[in-house]
């Protein structure tokens, strides 16, 4: 037995080594984190376009434009921060429509002082109300960029930059590298700058086109995994066929007794509510949410409201629990297998998303109607938005059983919301054939016994 045990240990050792080597190979051959990916928006990205418009004695003047090609993810306040590393010893002489966060060490310049001398500058947008002589088209929105789906007129942000100590021809210019984008926090990964065909610009009447002297693009993609954000929304559920209201999971976005952030919530009926809202955090943008079991700034409630012969109705309510923030141009994305049969929608805009191809239409984007409910007010009596959906039943798939009527996934403003566990969903009342069988059998037995007794009576 001892010999057999030793032999088995010797035979296992090579297998273990092989397993370790295989695991290491898989680890090092895995895709790099630069391949950011969002399952509901696989082709979404932020494209940064540099158009060199003119050459200067020691460099060039370029217009930099950021396009938000994401389906549903805005760049929200406090806005984007764009960074890069210069390839040589370039400096920024001046900027229009944006500014760097630091000037850096410009002590070697005896004459005019550059706007920024840092090797790795960080650029931010200017605020609304900036003087006209410091503006350029599509600038000065505090770094906020909406999506093309929802607001195409505000889906880009631009600034002009004058670069010195740089190349002065297409062949001598060295492209910046190591691009970073915070919008406003982490989550975006940017690729290398790639030279593309020069951008063309058309006159107002469309009869003449000019073009940039040189153009390069940088593509940045988003990943929830890289962002590692604390959840900011949660989902609760209810239905007409079950009295159970499934609340957001406890501590979905935090816990009330979290000692690391004291004073981060206030009770709805607290006499100190207004003083808490006007406290020091008001000017820093620090959230102040209503004290709840879930502690989320946003709750989405999905209520299965009515059942008709050929249709069924759902009510969606979005509630803001943040006393210090309202949400402009908010949007909601949800997944449900019956979204391909949406018949009517009340008080929300709607667009189907097809992340898996045109044959699968189970993802929908909703947003508010302009001047009606596109602004989700801060917590309080007006801090909610509601809509109802009328959906046609699909005879092949439709059922109220096993939580089918509830969404698989919900996003608010691009953030994945915390869902209740599936076993907590409101289910149909227990009426399966198995539960009726004992009652039916007992009645049958009683009938047979009664018939037998009557026969011998």
From Swiss-Prot:
Cellular localisation: Cell membrane
Lipidation (GPI-anchor amidated asparagine): 430
Entry GO CC: plasma membrane; side of membrane
Disulfide bonds: none
Signal sequence bounds: 1-35
Keyword NADP: no
Transmembrane annotation, as ranges: 437-457
Glycosylation sites: 45, 170, 178, 217, 242, 258, 326, 341, 361
Superkingdom as given in the UniProt entry: Eukaryota
Membrane topology: Lipid-anchor; GPI-anchor
InterPro entries to which the protein is assigned, alphabetical: COB_C, COBRA_pln
Removed propeptide positions: 431-457
GO terms, biological process: cellulose microfibril organization; plant-type cell wall cellulose biosynthetic process
Pfam families recorded: COB_C (PF25079), COBRA (PF04833)
Swiss-Prot/TrEMBL keywords: Cell membrane, Glycoprotein, GPI-anchor, Lipoprotein, Membrane, Signal, Transmembrane, Transmembrane helix
Function of the molecule: Involved in determining the orientation of cell expansion, probably by playing an important role in cellulose deposition. May act by recruiting cellulose synthesizing complexes to discrete positions on the cell surface.
Record family assignment: Belongs to the COBRA family.
The protein's name in its UniProt record: COBRA-like protein 3
Gene behind the chain: BC1L4
């Amino acid at each position: 037995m001892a010999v057999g045990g030793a032999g088995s240990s010797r035979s296992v050792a090579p297998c273990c080594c092989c397993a370790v080597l295989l695991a290491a190979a898989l680890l090092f051959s895995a895709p790099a984190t630069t391949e950011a990916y969002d399952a509901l928006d696989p082709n979404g990205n932020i494209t940064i376009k540099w158009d060199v418009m003119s050459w200067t004695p020691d460099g060039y003047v370029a217009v930099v434009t950021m396009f938000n090609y994401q389906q549903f993810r805005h760049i929200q306040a406090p806005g984007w921060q764009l960074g890069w590393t210069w390839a040589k010893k370039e400096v920024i002489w001046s900027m229009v429509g944006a500014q760097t966060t630091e000037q850096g060490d410009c002590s070697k310049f005896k004459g005019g002082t550059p706007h920024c001398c840092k090797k790795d500058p960080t650029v931010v947008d200017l605020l609304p109300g900036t003087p006209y002589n410091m503006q350029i088209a599509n600038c000065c929105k505090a770094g906020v960029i909406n999506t093309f789906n929802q607001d195409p007129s505000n889906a880009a942000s631009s600034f002009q930059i004058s670069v010195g100590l740089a190349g002065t021809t297409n062949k001598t210019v060295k492209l910046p590298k190591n691009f970073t984008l915070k919008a406003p926090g982490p989550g975006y990964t940017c690729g290398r700058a790639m030279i593309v065909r020069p951008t063309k610009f058309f006159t107002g009447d469309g009869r003449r086109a000019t073009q940039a002297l040189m153009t390069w693009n940088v593509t940045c993609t988003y990943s929830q995994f890289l962002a590692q954000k604390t959840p900011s929304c949660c989902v609760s559920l209810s239905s007409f066929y079950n009295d159970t209201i499934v609340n957001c999971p406890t501590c979905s976005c935090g816990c009330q007794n979290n000692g690391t952030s004291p004073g981060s919530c206030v009770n709805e009926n607290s006499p100190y509510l207004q003083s808490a809202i006007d406290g020091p955090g008001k000017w820093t943008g620090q959230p102040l949410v209503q004290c709840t079991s879930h502690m989320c700034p946003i709750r989405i409630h999905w209520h299965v409201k009515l059942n008709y012969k050929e249709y069924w109705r759902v009510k969606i309510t979005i509630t803001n629990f943040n006393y210090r923030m309202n949400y402009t141009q908010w949007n909601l994305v949800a997944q449900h297998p019956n979204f391909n049969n949406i018949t009517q929608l009340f008080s929300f805009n709607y667009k189907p998303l097809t992340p898996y191809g045109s044959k699968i239409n189970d993802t929908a984007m909703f947003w508010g109607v302009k001047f009606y409910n596109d602004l989700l007010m801060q917590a309080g009596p007006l801090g909610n938005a509601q809509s109802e959906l009328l959906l046609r039943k699909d005879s092949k798939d439709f059922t109220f059983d096993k939580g089918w009527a509830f969404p698989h996934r919900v996003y608010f403003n691009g953030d994945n919301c915390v869902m209740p566990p599936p076993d907590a969903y409101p289910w149909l009342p227990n009426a399966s054939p198995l539960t009726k069988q004992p009652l039916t059998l007992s009645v049958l037995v009683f009938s047979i016994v009664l018939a037998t007794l009557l026969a011998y009576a």
